[in-house]
Amino acid sequence: MDYINAAILGVIEGITEFLPISSTGHLIIAEQWLGHRSDMFNIVIQAGAILAVTIIYWRRLVDLVLGWRDPVNRDYAAKLIVAFLITAILGLVVKKLGFELPETATPIAWALIIGGIWMIFAEWAAARRPPHKEITWLVAILVGIAQIVAGVFPGTSRSGATIFVAMLAGTGNRASATEFAFLVGIPTMYAASAYELLKTFRDGGAAGEDWTALGIAFVVSTVVAFIAVKWLLAYIRSNRFTLFAIYRIILGVLLLGMAATGLIA
């Protein structure tokens, strides 16, 4: 993979990883022209996106750790931990059972379309409730489950699944739902990346990698994800997610058309 292609894929990952539009759906289209992504490459560009969100929320994370004596911080941190543990336990069960849909165009396309419809419904339902900021235990549990659903069904979008299940479960405030979804995603994605990285090294998948290309992709993904998430957090203060939902549906239909005509696997 040449350096320009690595940078382009880093841009795509950075934009799409935390926006509720599915990074998988975009990367599967891109690789038709830019070449197949190795497991190591996928891990590296995702790690860059996770690092960006960690940087954005570092003060919040430090506050949760150092301010554990505060009942509000302690309650919030406990809910983050429970959501993460639910994801981790269910993730191990799913891995053991070997249940995961293939990353091919058709299932990803349907996940995009169904997810877009789900987002429109969630916005409609949330608009009819008071914009509560509270993260309840029900929200924490459902967010933990939603992360696994997103992992099992490529194209769902982890951020989309978690944000909108939080909104439907009672956290009507978009900013609060998004913050909790992103904070839960930090340990979840670090753990998943570490697991996949160890597995890749153990299986010899790192042999022959172009480390310069990996470095470029990592840096680009980090910078672009930082900009994308900062923009998203500002956008949702006064806007709904409806445009993302419409975009998902259009992309899903496009993928179905490309699959039907043989342009994509």
Swiss-Prot record:
<dbReference type="GO" id="GO:0009252">
    <property type="term" value="P:peptidoglycan biosynthetic process"/>
</dbReference>
<keyword id="KW-0133">Cell shape</keyword>
<protein>
    <recommendedName>
        <fullName>Undecaprenyl-diphosphatase</fullName>
        <ecNumber>3.6.1.27</ecNumber>
    </recommendedName>
</protein>
<dbReference type="Pfam" id="PF02673">
    <property type="entry name" value="BacA"/>
</dbReference>
<keyword id="KW-0997">Cell inner membrane</keyword>
<dbReference type="GO" id="GO:0050380">
    <property type="term" value="F:undecaprenyl-diphosphatase activity"/>
</dbReference>
<feature type="transmembrane region" description="Helical">
    <location>
        <begin position="80"/>
        <end position="100"/>
    </location>
</feature>
<feature type="transmembrane region" description="Helical">
    <location>
        <begin position="38"/>
        <end position="58"/>
    </location>
</feature>
<feature type="transmembrane region" description="Helical">
    <location>
        <begin position="244"/>
        <end position="264"/>
    </location>
</feature>
<comment type="function">
    <text>Catalyzes the dephosphorylation of undecaprenyl diphosphate (UPP). Confers resistance to bacitracin.</text>
</comment>
<feature type="transmembrane region" description="Helical">
    <location>
        <begin position="216"/>
        <end position="236"/>
    </location>
</feature>
<keyword id="KW-0378">Hydrolase</keyword>
<feature type="transmembrane region" description="Helical">
    <location>
        <begin position="178"/>
        <end position="198"/>
    </location>
</feature>
<dbReference type="GO" id="GO:0071555">
    <property type="term" value="P:cell wall organization"/>
</dbReference>
<keyword id="KW-1133">Transmembrane helix</keyword>
<feature type="transmembrane region" description="Helical">
    <location>
        <begin position="107"/>
        <end position="127"/>
    </location>
</feature>
<dbReference type="GO" id="GO:0008360">
    <property type="term" value="P:regulation of cell shape"/>
</dbReference>
<keyword id="KW-0812">Transmembrane</keyword>
<dbReference type="GO" id="GO:0046677">
    <property type="term" value="P:response to antibiotic"/>
</dbReference>
<feature type="transmembrane region" description="Helical">
    <location>
        <begin position="135"/>
        <end position="155"/>
    </location>
</feature>
<keyword id="KW-0046">Antibiotic resistance</keyword>
<comment type="similarity">
    <text>Belongs to the UppP family.</text>
</comment>
<keyword id="KW-0573">Peptidoglycan synthesis</keyword>
<keyword id="KW-0961">Cell wall biogenesis/degradation</keyword>
<keyword id="KW-1003">Cell membrane</keyword>
<dbReference type="GO" id="GO:0005886">
    <property type="term" value="C:plasma membrane"/>
</dbReference>
<dbReference type="InterPro" id="IPR003824">
    <property type="entry name" value="UppP"/>
</dbReference>
<keyword id="KW-0472">Membrane</keyword>
